[in-house]
């Protein structure tokens, strides 16, 4: 709880033992404003969410065993031969019917004389619960709980656990109670035996014995002691629930001579108050024959699993008691799925109105073969009439033919006539879908749209609520999907479809034109200006710029015309012009170099990984301006001292560390990437953002938002990763976290305390203050991201850094993003091939394998790979070499093109500079410790002014300075610049012998300063004025034809032969040399301040009192590079 009495979402989810997503969903249902897991809400709102979540968990609480209420027959559902329970569908209560204690009916001889005793009979259709007191029905022998003697109707459970299809008819009044009949003599006393419903085909058997397959028999009402209940703990919901039949049990009254059951009168439609037991995902629809192993009373297979129920029960109206109007008793049983491939067309009969069927996807269990007789022939299930229904295939969500499509309410289903042909003139349900598909020229091979068949589907959706309602809606929609039609029926399509096909042939070209016009019209109508545009190669044509700005090219040409530039649509514009035009339209411009490097271009998780994903540690990149305390913050997290050992106290590499912390009582790992903050290391920061899952933006509380802070924000946005702001140095004087929040809000980063969604944590790295809170926020943010990877595949990842070690050879820092990297794996990193010889982590501990989100240093590459390239492990070296060869040729062509572009100089400009003597070149050979440093130095050299001095880098590579480098420098007159590297044996001696200048640096600041000084040294020096002093004319003396000015030196000094300017008022009357300087009739070289002297010039004699003489001299000065 916060100090203001509010509660965070993640604290509320922790109290309730739920995920943050569930609490956020509940808040959204209650219209409570909560943007993320760390949002704050009031205690009242928290109480509403708690009550809603507790109400949503009530059905789960009701599933626990409780003492049954008087008059309720609580039944347990358990598969025979299994010790575990599975939830079962509650059965509708019999309205106002009281029945005596029933016992399993004694088996009688089957009526069919053709059936031998040894052959197991196929289970028949389940009997519905009867309203008569003399006949009770249950799909299978239930296991009975305790029940009081009083017989009361069982109350209906809440519709949340068993949504039913409601029918808009008046409610049926309760039926009159039927007097209870006396129980047979064999029944036990009422007080000693619990009451249960007896199925007519149940036979007394031991409780633990597997059920035997029953024979068709005449129902006989007897009572017997119920079987002993197994020791397994039942799970019941609400009302009496029959054990889920492994196949449809024998139907009562199905034979031709069976008596019609007594039905209590009711005004409601038949079957409106009944439901049928729920089937699992692999169960057949009611009325369909049963496969072996699923028939009622059939011995279960050894090791059978507990029955699983998929989804929620679906009411099938009229399925409870077919004798009441769903189908006349004694009639032939209709086929469960209509005309199936193995069923005669005449076997199907219409379904009663309001009947709803459900198709469910198989839940991954293998199909069960059809039942077989001992001689190997398939068993024909015995029905309840003279006709029998052959076994059919198990229905799935996508049946093989339209004959298995779900029926419409009222019994009509297209194509259900004899032979599977649809009625002539009857419009098909998916004609509109076909017309749309033909218009869009999309192939009909794909699965068609899901159509919900039924008139009262809204009532089904209305009853489906709560947290589990969304899942049930999805299952229901899939179950009612109409399947695609076979090719034979598509050929015999009605006339409208044929007309559309003819039109399609005639209008192909017109349709293409129409679609092009629609796209153009939509683009013109949209006219939405982008937030920013990214210029790929520092130039764009007018048409390309117009497309990016979503304006007409004529608008761009008009804008340029008013600026004095005559342009055409194909003319290329340089970067300043693009920025000027884009700013006129209110769109900022970004260069593509860095933003493209920060975008995540390769998806590391492939489709085959989806079944094997596990949670992986998050990768956190620490970014920010230089000297804002990024490495110190990581030191506080790791409890190490890295920053103290860095040259100049600044980070110049990407450091990869893995930290293990305690969170919610369990160890959690975080992989940190520490990026440099200096402006030269832009590419390094972009690479760090490309592989990260969350970015930590470090901002100093005493310095605020700086240029590299803005750059880091743009990197994180380009990579589309969440940002957590750490406001560091809050312990310093002058620290103002609120000022930092204000500056960040100007960059659209609004703190949660101010109503935004960005987590901002004030920390102190030096005093380790609020470090735990920062780590907790990082874990909470990454939990929402749901980071996963597949560790059971070959590794893939990114090269974070690479360098050449003189002892180990090429070394690369690899971040494994998916899979597991092992010693001996063949790795291809861009155009570089390697075989992992050894791996070490950030603590220099050797590893044999590295899982997802691990950063390791790997040895064994053939050359130094390029930082930022993706690497991938291949099963053998042959396949890896083939991939690397193609990449190497592409990289070579790209490198040559870049070199030619960098050396492209205008011949006229070069000859003009050569004639003027202004063409200066500084040749460099650059060697650094790692690839990232080489990139940073080259990028910084590109920023230096090149108007008068050209910098040519003849060679740039990671590694030590060799004797070959010295020979190249001697031949080209180059300077060797080393950065954090050493010289090989013999290189120093060769450099001294050839007079090659070798410079070594360990801080990038000093390196760039010296190179700029060397470039300025190539420039010609310039003459500048240096002030000497001033004097005032107080008297004028005429000597011959010339005149001498008697002066008093006010400031500085006067020197003989210096330059002077004579000021008279605001006008300069003379500028020239001072030829004569005397004091007391003696020639002197200079006169200091406070002395009088005589000043004479050969070319000026018009002195006047009050003139001011300014003395200066011209000196040579080293030129500076101008931008």
From Swiss-Prot:
Disulphides: none
Range of residues in the leader sequence: none
Biased composition (Basic and acidic residues): 425-439
Region G3: start-end pairs: 674-677
Stated name of the protein: Translation initiation factor IF-2
Organism: Synechococcus sp. (strain WH7803)
Region listing for G2, in residue ranges: 649-653
One Gene Ontology molecular-function label: translation initiation factor activity
Free-text function comment from the UniProt entry: One of the essential components for the initiation of protein synthesis. Protects formylmethionyl-tRNA from spontaneous hydrolysis and promotes its binding to the 30S ribosomal subunits. Also involved in the hydrolysis of GTP during the formation of the 70S ribosomal complex.
Coiled-coil features, chain-numbered ranges: none
């Amino acid at each position: 709880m916060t100090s203001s009495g509010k509660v965070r979402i993640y604290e509320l989810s922790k109290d309730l033992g739920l995920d943050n997503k569930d609490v956020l969903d509940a808040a959204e249902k209650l219209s409570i404003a909560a943007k993320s897991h760390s949002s704050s809400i009031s205690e009242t709102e928290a109480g509403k969410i708690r009550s809603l979540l507790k109400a949503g968990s009530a059905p789960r609480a009701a599933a626990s065993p409780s003492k049954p209420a008087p008059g309720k027959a609580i039944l347990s559902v358990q598969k025979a031969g299994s010790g575990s329970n599975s939830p079962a569908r509650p059965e509708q209560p019999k309205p106002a019917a009281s029945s005596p204690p029933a016992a399993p009916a004694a088996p009688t001889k089957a009526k069919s004389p053709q059936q031998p005793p040894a052959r197991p009979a196929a289970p028949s259709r389940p009997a519905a619960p009867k309203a008569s007191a003399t006949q009770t029905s249950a799909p299978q022998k239930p296991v009975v709980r305790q029940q009081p003697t009083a017989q009361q109707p069982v109350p209906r459970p809440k519709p949340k656990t068993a949504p039913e299809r409601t029918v808009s008819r008046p409610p049926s009044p309760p039926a009159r109670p039927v007097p209870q009949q006396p129980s047979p003599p064999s029944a036990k006393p009422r007080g000693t035996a619990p009451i249960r419903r007896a199925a007519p085909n149940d036979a007394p058997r031991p409780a633990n014995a597997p059920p035997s397959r029953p024979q068709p028999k005449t129902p006989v009402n007897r009572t017997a002691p119920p079987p002993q209940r197994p020791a397994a703990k039942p799970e019941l919901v609400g009302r009496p629930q029959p054990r889920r039949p492994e196949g449809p049990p024998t139907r009562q009254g199905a034979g031709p001579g069976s008596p019609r059951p007594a039905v209590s009168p009711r005004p409601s439609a038949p079957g409106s108050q009944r439901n049928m037991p729920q089937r699992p995902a692999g169960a057949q629809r009611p009325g369909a024959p049963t496969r072996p192993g699923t028939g009622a009373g059939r011995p279960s297979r050894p090791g059978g699993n507990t029955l699983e129920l998929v989804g929620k029960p679906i009411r099938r109206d009229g399925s409870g008691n077919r004798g009441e109007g769903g189908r006349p008793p004694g009639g032939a049983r209709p086929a469960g799925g209509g005309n199936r491939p193995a069923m005669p067309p005449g076997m199907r009969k219409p379904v009663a109105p309001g009947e709803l069927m459900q198709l469910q996807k198989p839940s991954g269990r293998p199909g069960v073969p059809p039942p077989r007789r001992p001689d190997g022939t398939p068993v024909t299930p015995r029905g309840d009439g003279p006709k029998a229904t052959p076994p059919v295939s198990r229905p799935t969500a996508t049946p093989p033919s339209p004959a298995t499509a779900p029926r419409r309410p009222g019994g009509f289903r297209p194509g259900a006539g004899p032979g599977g042909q649809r009625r002539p003139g009857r419009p098909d349900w998916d004609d509109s879908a076909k017309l749309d598909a033909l218009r869009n020229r999309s192939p009909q091979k794909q699965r068609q749209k899901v159509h919900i068949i039924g008139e009262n589907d809204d009532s089904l959706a209305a009853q489906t609520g709560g947290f589990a309602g969304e899942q049930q809606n999805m299952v229901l929609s899939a179950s009612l999907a109409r399947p695609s039609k076979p090719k034979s029926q598509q050929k015999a399509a009605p006339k409208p479809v044929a007309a559309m096909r003819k039109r399609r042939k005639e209008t192909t070209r017109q349709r293409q034109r129409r679609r092009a016009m629609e796209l153009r019209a939509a683009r013109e109508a949209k006219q939405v200006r982008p937030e920013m545009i990214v210029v790929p190669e520092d130039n764009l044509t007018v048409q390309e710029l117009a497309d990016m700005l979503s304006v007409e090219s004529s608008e761009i040409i008009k804008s340029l015309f008013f600026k004095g530039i005559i342009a055409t649509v194909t003319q290329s514009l340089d970067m300043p012009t693009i920025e000027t035009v884009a700013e006129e339209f209110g769109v900022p411009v970004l260069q593509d170099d860095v933003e493209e490097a920060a975008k995540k271009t390769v998806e590391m998780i492939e489709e085959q990984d989806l079944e094997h994903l596990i949670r992986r540690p998050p990768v956190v990149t620490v970014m920010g301006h230089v000297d804002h305390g990024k490495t110190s913050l990581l030191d506080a997290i790791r409890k190490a001292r890295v920053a103290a050992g860095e040259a100049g106290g600044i980070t110049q590499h990407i450091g990869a560390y893995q930290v293990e912390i305690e969170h919610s009582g369990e160890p959690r790992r975080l992989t940190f990437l520490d990026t440099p903050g200096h402006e030269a290391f832009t590419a390094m920061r972009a690479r760090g953002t490309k592989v990260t899952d969350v970015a930590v933006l470090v901002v100093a509380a005493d310095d605020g938002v700086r240029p590299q802070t803005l750059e880091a924000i743009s990197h994180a946005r380009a990579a589309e990763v969440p940002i957590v702001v750490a406001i560091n140095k809050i312990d310093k004087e002058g620290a103002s976290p609120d000022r930092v929040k204000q500056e960040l809000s100007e960059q659209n980063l609004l703190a949660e305390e101010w109503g935004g969604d960005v987590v901002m944590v004030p920390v102190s790295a030096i005093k380790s203050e609020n470090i735990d809170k920062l780590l907790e926020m990082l874990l909470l943010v990454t939990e929402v991201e749901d980071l996963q990877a597949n560790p059971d595949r070959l590794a893939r990842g990114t090269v974070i850094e690479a360098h050449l070690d003189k002892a180990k050879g090429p070394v690369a820092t690899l971040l494994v993003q998916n899979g597991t990297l092992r010693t001996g794996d063949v790795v291809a990193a861009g155009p570089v091939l390697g075989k992992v010889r050894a791996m070490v982590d950030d603590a220099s501990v050797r590893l044999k394998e590295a899982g997802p989100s691990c950063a390791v240093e790997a040895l064994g590459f053939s050359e130094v790979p390029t930082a930022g390239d993706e690497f991938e492990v291949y099963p053998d070296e042959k396949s890896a070499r083939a991939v690397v060869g193609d990449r190497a040729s592409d990289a070579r062509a790209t490198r040559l093109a870049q070199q030619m572009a960098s050396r492209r100089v205008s011949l006229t400009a070069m000859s003009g500079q050569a004639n003027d003597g202004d063409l200066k070149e500084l040749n460099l050979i650059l060697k650094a410790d790692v690839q990232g440093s080489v990139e940073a130095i080259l990028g910084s050299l590109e920023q230096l002014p090149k108007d008068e001095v050209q910098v040519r880098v003849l060679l740039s590579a990671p590694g030590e300075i060799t004797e070959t480098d010295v020979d190249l420098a001697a031949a080209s007159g180059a300077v060797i610049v080393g950065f954090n590297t050493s010289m090989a044996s013999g290189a120093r001696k060769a450099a001294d012998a050839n007079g090659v200048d070798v410079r070594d640096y360990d801080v990038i600041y000093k390196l760039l300063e010296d190179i700029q000084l060397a470039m300025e040294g190539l420039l010609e020096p310039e003459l500048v004025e240096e002030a000497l002093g001033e004097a005032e004319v107080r008297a004028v003396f005429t000597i011959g034809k010339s005149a001498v000015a008697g002066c008093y030196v006010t400031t500085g000094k006067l020197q003989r032969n210096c330059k002077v300017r004579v000021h008279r008022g605001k006008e300069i009357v003379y500028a020239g040399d001072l030829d004569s300087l005397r004091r007391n009739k003696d020639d002197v070289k200079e006169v200091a301040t406070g002395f009088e002297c005589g000043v004479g010039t050969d070319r000026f004699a018009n002195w006047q009192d009050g003139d001011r003489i300014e003395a200066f001299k011209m000196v040579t000065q080293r030129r500076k590079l101008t931008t």
